[in-house]
Design a protein with these regions (language model features):
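Short, well-ordered secondary-structure micro-motifs
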Residues: 23, 62-63, 135-136, 161-164
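Short, active-site-adjacent cap segments at secondary-structure transitions
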Residues: 19-21, 56-61, 158-160
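Ligand-binding beta-strand-loop-alpha-helix segment within the catalytic cores
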Residues: 63-133, 143-144
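Short beta-strand segments
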Residues: 12-16, 53-54, 124-127, 152-153
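Conserved small/polar residues in nucleotide/adenosyl-binding loops
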Residues: 199-201
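Acidic, metal-binding active-site segment of PIN/NYN-like and related structure-specific nucleases
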Residues: 141-169
Length: 201
């Protein structure tokens, strides 16, 4: 297994839910088309990719709706996690449709995803545990899978030390280790349902 990991590079990508559902439908179709092309290219270069999908606006809207009847933060988080898994299923089926070697299930844990990456070129998952953002899940998966890189793909250009939309003095961070990224994403520190972390946009 160790030799196989050295021969085939592993990378983890966190896709913010906002990237999957831009306001204009043409942009959405264009983006998904580009994703398909990229997936074919990556698979042809013997890369293994773990993809963690965020819930985006659908998750936040569902949580807002459920708040009228549910007071439990954990139950509200489960609503958001369900939205991430729905988005993950969309990406999984798109990749299966073009013939990529994709895990046939949406894993519930990062350890399960890491095991599936031994067998498949692509593993797609959503959220896992109430209180954790999908960015934090991606960093945890990078650790579990021994990935070379963890890419946070969102609608903000950099990772910042605080929300650049609220703070003019927010500093962009260009180079981070997995451990530093884990600290920023708040692995092990629960957040309120629907809350955005520093890089969960």
């Amino acid at each position: 297994v160790c030799e196989a990991r050295l021969m085939t590079s592993r990378h983890i990508v966190a896709l913010g839910g906002s990237l999957l559902r831009p306001e204009e439908s043409e942009k959405r179709s264009e983006w998904l088309g580009q994703l398909r092309q990229l997936a074919v290219h990556l698979e042809g270069n013997e890369r293994k990719i773990g993809i963690v999908i965020g819930g985006g606006l659908p998750a936040r809207e569902a949580i807002e709706l459920a708040k009228n009847c549910i007071s439990s933060s954990e139950k509200l988080d489960q609503v958001g996690i369900a939205a991430t898994r729905l988005n993950a299923t969309v990406i999984q089926q798109i990749l299966l449709d073009i013939g990529c070697n994709v895990a046939p299930e949406i894993p519930h844990t990062t350890s399960q995803s890491a095991e599936l990456l031994e067998q498949y070129n692509f593993v797609v998952m959503g959220g896992t545990t109430p209180g954790h953002t999908t960015d934090a899940v991606a960093v945890a998966l990078a650790r579990d899978a021994g990935a070379r890189t963890c890419i946070i793909a969102t609608n903000v250009s950099h990772v910042y030390d605080k929300d650049p939309r609220q703070f003019d003095d927010a500093q962009s961070l260009t180079n981070l280790t997995i451990d530093q990224l884990a600290e920023i994403t708040g692995i092990g520190e629960p957040l309120a349902p629907g809350t955005l972390s520093l890089i969960h946009i």
